[in-house]
Structures are given as C-alpha cells and as structure tokens.
Amino acid sequence: MQDGQIIERYVFPSPSPNVNLFMITYWSSGLRVKGLLAVPKKEGLYDGLLYLRGGIKSVGMVRPARIAQFASEGFVVFAPFYRGNQGGEGNEDFAGKDREDAFSGFELLKRNPKVDPDRIHIFGFSRGGVMALLTAIEKRDAASVVSWGGVTDMELTYEERKDLRRMMKRVIGGSPKKVPEEYKWRTPIYHLENLCCPVLIIHGGKDQNVSIEHAYRLEKRLKELGKRVTTWYFPNFTHYFPPAMNRKMVTSSCQWMKNQVLS
C-alpha cells in the first residue's frame, strides 16, 4: 500500500447541510492512521486543504464543525488525527515521525477526484504550525501554508511552557540540552531554505499558549531567505480569537489561500 491510500471510509454525521463528512483510515509509513475528510456536496473541482490540528492525544482533537467550516469556504479538507489517536496505530511524537501522517495526508488529498492536485494548501494551528511548515518544506508543490498561533521553534516551546516539559521530555527523548538535535529536527525555522510556497502568519499578541515570538522568528527567517510572507498580527488577542473574529479569520485566510498562485 502507498502513503495516502484510503483503507477504510465511512460516513460521519455532518454539522453542515452543504458538506459531507467521512471518517477515514489511511496508510502512513506502514501504519493505519485515522482522520476526518470534509467534501463539499456541490459538484466541481476544489482546492484541497490539509488541516493540521494542535495539541497532543485528546487535547486539541479535530472538531467536525471546524473542518466543515473550512470546507464550506470551498475546499476539500482532510484533517489527520495523527498516529495513535482514535484507534490509529503507532504513537505521536510531537512533530517527529508523526509528521509523516501529515505528508501522507497531503498525498491523500492529491488522490481525491474532487481536488485540483496543483492547488493543495496546508493549514496549521498551534502545534499544527510546526506540522504545516514541515509538510510545506517536504511537499514542494504545496500552493500555500498558513500558521495560525503556530509553534515554529520547539526549544522555545520547551522554555515557555513549563507545563509541557514532562510530556516533551517523554515523547522527544529529553530536554533541549540533552537531545538538541531532536529539537532542531522538529524546528522548521532551521529548514526553510527548501520552502517554495507563500506563507501567511496569524498570531495574537497576548497569546500565552504559543507566544508571538514564534511568529516573529518565523517572519524574520523567511524574510532573510527572500521567501513570500504575509503577517496578520492582532495585539489584543490571545491563542483563541473571539468567535466573530475567528469566523472572519477563517473566511479571510481561505480567501488568501485561494489568491495564491503557485509560481
């Protein structure tokens, strides 16, 4: 079996009358991994969107309403749960080998008959920001990438989030001092030379889950390399935007993605 190949798919209750949802089991580096697929009901060829969730395990799990919301903007959306979740095989390792589940998710979208294979975008929220950037670096035919409240520097996350240190040491194999190479491997700002697509950074200035310093470091490095980058910074917002602004940002970011032309 090839990465991105669907093993099993069944209908999942959709919160939107215009979107079909499917629970998917797909192939990723020899593992059966789960995810959620959202497909607009209307016939046509759509842009694809790989939605990369934040958190780990049950924290930050993919929400059907969120996926349907993006699909309603005119995308076929696939959201991997990452290995080891919801009955999937393997174990998450926080942007280590589980990044392959995102890579395979990109291939899954390419195989979908309702997706334009040249118009696949990558969206990451929180920890998903790392996954999105690593996937865009790996998949050089990605049309664009969005990092919303996204982690970009894993060592900075270790420094800032004392509440996550125990988990990070367990899944990564130690602290940044003990295994610096593991943190560097998981930090996309060290690997942006190979990024080809435009980047949109969305971040709240009062974010205490993922500080805006992550966004600043990403922006700085992209500009040093002459990459295309757009920033939408909101000084008074935290990690979670107010509901009305959140909805507006979904629509605006989707429009931004559609406006990007793969050069």
Regions found by a protein language model. Give the residues of each.
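N-terminal cap/lid segment of alpha/beta-hydrolase-fold proteins
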Residues: 2-42
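Conserved alpha/beta-hydrolase "acid-adjacent" motif
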Residues: 208-214
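Short substrate-entry loop that stabilizes the transition state in hydrolases
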Residues: 44-46, 51-90, 155
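Short beta-strand/loop motif that positions the catalytic acidic residue
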Residues: 195, 201-203, 207
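C-terminal catalytic histidine-bearing segment of alpha/beta-hydrolase fold enzymes
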Residues: 216, 224-263
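Alpha/beta-hydrolase active-site loop
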Residues: 93-113
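Alpha/beta-hydrolase fold nucleophile elbow
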Residues: 115-126
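Hydrolase active-site cap/lid region
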Residues: 133-179
